[in-house]
Design a protein with these regions (language model features):
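Conserved donor-binding loops in enzymes that form glycosidic bonds
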Residues: 10, 87, 137
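Hydrophobic, well-ordered secondary-structure scaffolds
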Residues: 1-3, 85, 97, 111-121
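Active-site phosphate-binding strand-loop segment of PLP-dependent enzymes
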Residues: 112-194
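Conserved coil-to-alpha-helix start sites within the AMP-binding
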Residues: 88-94
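Phosphate-binding glycine-rich loop
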Residues: 29, 33-82, 96-100, 106-108, ...
Length: 195
């Protein structure tokens, strides 16, 4: 039997990408340079958002979303408050919540979508619930209309982990733009990657 090896990841770079990489290397500005600023502006425009802030990973983006809510004077988020999350996701959704001393409340998913089930969310809400962290899994949008309605009725914040669903739409809006904030990722295991 022949041993066949498959690369976990491989590049598909052409001349244009190689020149772009060389331009960045020659500039000696590997972060926060003009190319990043341009990418942020074009990304925000494409998704019809006011802002886009690029960081090193979707994991860091999730952490920054939680941190910005935790340290903001506009939101009353403190240690011990509860965050409703889907039972199916990645550690990178859960760890930032835990890192800030917030309590994870896992709710079951809808078997048809693999996303958080709004009916289960309603059952989990109590006085300590401050946030719903929806995850749009594998290009499949959560029921964002129901989640937004639940959040509005209960004065709860909705944020989205959209790392697996870049470019997906829910009705006429891109996923990741339906809550207060959304995270995106270009990690190599996702359907669109960057370097």
């Amino acid at each position: 039997m022949k041993n066949t090896k498959y690369n976990l990841a491989s590049d598909s770079w052409g001349e244009e990408e190689i020149f772009a990489i060389n331009d960045v290397i020659k500039s000696n500005q590997f972060t926060m340079g003009p190319k990043v600023k341009k990418f942020e502006e074009e990304f925000a425009d494409y998704f019809k958002s006011d802002y886009a802030i690029m960081v090193n990973s979707g994991s860091s983006a999730n952490l920054l979303m939680i941190a910005s809510l935790f340290y903001s004077n506009d939101y009353d988020l403190k240690k011990g408050d509860e965050v409703i999350v889907p039972a199916v996701s990645w550690s990178t959704t859960y760890y930032p919540v835990n890192q800030y001393g917030l309590k994870l409340v896992f709710v079951d998913i809808d078997r048809n979508t693999l996303n958080i089930d709004p009916k289960e969310v309603i059952k989990a809400i109590n006085q300590k619930t401050k946030l719903i962290f929806a995850v749009n899994l594998l290009g499949n949008p959560s029921d964002l209309e129901d989640l937004k309605s639940i959040c509005k009725k209960n004065e709860i914040i909705l944020i989205e982990d959209n790392c697996e669903s870049l470019g997906a739409k829910y009705h006429d809006r891109y996923t990741g733009t339906c809550g207060l904030m959304g995270s995106f990722s270009f990690f190599f295991s996702h359907h669109m990657q960057t370097m």
